Amino acid sequence: MCDQLAFASQRKPYQHMDLRHHVRDIPDYPKPGILFRDITPLLAHPEALTASVEEMAKPFLDQKIDVVAAAEARGFIFGTPLAMRLNAGFVPIRKPGKLPFDLHSFAYELEYGSDELQIHVDGIKPGQRVLIVDDLLATGGTVEACLRLLEKCDAEIVGCSFLIHLVALGGEARLSPYHVHSVLEYGGDDAEDELSIQNRPPGPSV
């Protein structure tokens, strides 16, 4: 309750903030022809960060969320404060070799190979109401894998919340029938460049 009151006392001044002003476009990164959406200015701005968390949480405030789940690494940035805002627990979803206890695992295919996500078997109890959180929805592959992993836990998945949605990449369709909420939507002429970012060969896990 204290966390909810703290957020409530802060959110009113930021209701009309244009968060796009705090997302920086970086052309030709990480290679020529790619446009990168850099959220580090938003993260460094206290009011913008608070407003982002508030807007990501807004549709789920009355949904009685038990657990917020997020995949490494950038999902952790928003997952923990959203859990605090919703008076819920936080459960990390990680790559292999990062979690020390008994695990549920889900392997999935990527354009350049395969990957795997894992969660502790006691992280989510059957029937708990879970919200999945990430900074970005693009092609939807990682979030879809998170959904399949949470289904193995017999969780009740309430929906997914993102700061940014790259609409033209079609990720939302992969998350059907679950409710998808995003704060900022981008699309149009830069869709192919942003698709290139999401499909680049995976690097080492964080």
Swiss-Prot record:
Q: Write out the annotated subcellular location.
A: Cytoplasm
The EC category is transferase
**Organism expressing this protein natively:** Rhodopirellula baltica (strain DSM 10527 / NCIMB 13988 / SH1)
Question: What's the protein called, per UniProt?
Answer: Adenine phosphoribosyltransferase
A single Gene Ontology biological process assigned to it is:
adenine salvage
Alphabetical list of PANTHER family matching this protein? ADENINE PHOSPHORIBOSYLTRANSFERASE (PTHR32315:SF3)
Quick check: keyword Glycosyltransferase in the entry? yes
Query: Which function does this protein serve?
Result: Catalyzes a salvage reaction resulting in the formation of AMP, that is energically less costly than de novo synthesis.
HAMAP family tied to this protein: Aden_phosphoribosyltr (MF_00004)
Give the matching Pfam families: Pribosyltran (PF00156)
- One GO location term (cellular component): cytoplasm
Query: What are the record keywords, sorted?
Result: Cytoplasm, Glycosyltransferase, Purine salvage, Transferase
Gene Ontology molecular function terms on file = adenine binding; adenine phosphoribosyltransferase activity; AMP binding
| Subunit comment | Homodimer.
Task: State the reactions this protein catalyses.
Answer: AMP + diphosphate = 5-phospho-alpha-D-ribose 1-diphosphate + adenine
